[in-house]
Swiss-Prot record:
GO terms for molecular function: large ribosomal subunit rRNA binding; structural constituent of ribosome. The gene is rplK. This is Large ribosomal subunit protein uL11. Forms part of the ribosomal stalk which helps the ribosome interact with GTP-bound translation factors. NCBIfam families: L11_bact (TIGR01632). Part of the ribosomal stalk of the 50S ribosomal subunit. Interacts with L10 and the large rRNA to form the base of the stalk. L10 forms an elongated spine to which L12 dimers bind in a sequential fashion forming a multimeric L10(L12)X complex. CDD domains: Ribosomal_L11 (cd00349). One or more lysine residues are methylated. GO terms for biological process: translation. Belongs to the universal ribosomal protein uL11 family.
Amino acid sequence: MAKKIESYIKLQVAAQEANPSPPVGPALGQHGVNIMEFCKAFNSKTQEINKGMKVPVVITVYSDRSFSFVTKTPPAALLILKIIDIKKGSGSPHLDKVGSITRAQLEEVASMKMKDLNANNMDSAVNIIAGTARSMGIMVEG
């Protein structure tokens, strides 16, 4: 028989840097999950991702206080900022442009995000990422 699910916890944690301090500790502690066990498992699973990159994680907590988790790819906005090497997007995106991104760079981000996107092909994925870039005040070229 399957374990009974008690709750889901959604967090964004820096890759390879999970520790018991907030936000991880309080979120898991109130559900009775072994925090250090999660931190070790998460840090080992995110070894291939750049250290410090925020990674969304969905933790499933079961009634016997055990857990499982699924990591997703880093948010598209963070990948875009990293690829064009700027600190943050525009405060008023339709008036102030903070940078530009090429079609090749969009395809690179889309290929990283493809498994988490609701897209059937690469063109659709690129359009989704281009929309994210535009909403951040980044000019899309091509």
